[in-house]
C-alpha cells in the first residue's frame, strides 16, 4: 500500500475518508447532492489533515480512493486522485477552516435553500420554532463555559449572498458574512444552495439537518401567508383563507 493510500484506508467507520463517503450517499438520498452537486470536507483532529470530496463525482458512488487529502499547515495536497480535480468549493472550505475554526463543512444544493433564497432578501429569518434550539448562538455559558445554542424565543438569521459563475468567486462575499454575521454557522447562496460548518462533523451534520428542516418549514409557512419570524399568537392574523 502506498503512502498516499494509507491516508484513506481505515477500518474505523468514523475515519474521515469513510465518513465522507457514507454522508455523501445519505445526502444524495436526501436529494441534497444529486448530479455530482455539493461537497463535504472533514478535518482529521488526529493529523490536522483536510479530507475533501472531489469535483465531478456522483456522491452515491464515492469511495475513499476518490478523496483528496491536504496538509492543514502547508495547504499542500498529500493525496490527489489521478482521475479527478479538487472541488471548486475548496477555497470556501479553507476559508471556513481558517476563519471559523471549523472541523467540517457541508455544501448541499438543497431545494429548500434555493427556494428560501428566492423568497427572502439578504437573510433567512425564522423564529419561535423548537428546532432553532439545535443551532449555535455564538455565546458561551458563563458558568459551564460551554457553547450555548439559540433558544426557542430567538430568531435564527442566516445571510444570503449572490451566486457567481464560479464557486471560488464567492470567497469575498463569504469573508464579508464572517464579519457581518460572526455567530452564523451557515450561508445561503442564492439560486445555488447552502454551506454549513461546525466544530466537528457531527455538529455540522446536526446544524445542516436542523437548518434544512427550518427552511422547509419556512417555505410552508410562507405558502400559508405566515411570516416565518412572526410573533407567537400572531399566526392566524396572517393565514390565507381557503377558497370556498
Swiss-Prot record:
Annotated organism of origin: Saccharomyces cerevisiae (strain YJM789)
GO cellular component: cytoplasm
Family: Belongs to the aldolase class II family. MtnB subfamily.
Active site: 130 (proton donor/acceptor)
Protein's job: Catalyzes the dehydration of methylthioribulose-1-phosphate (MTRu-1-P) into 2,3-diketo-5-methylthiopentyl-1-phosphate (DK-MTP-1-P).
Binding site for Zn(2+): 107, 109, 192
Binding site for substrate: 89
Listed name of the protein: Methylthioribulose-1-phosphate dehydratase
The encoding gene: MDE1
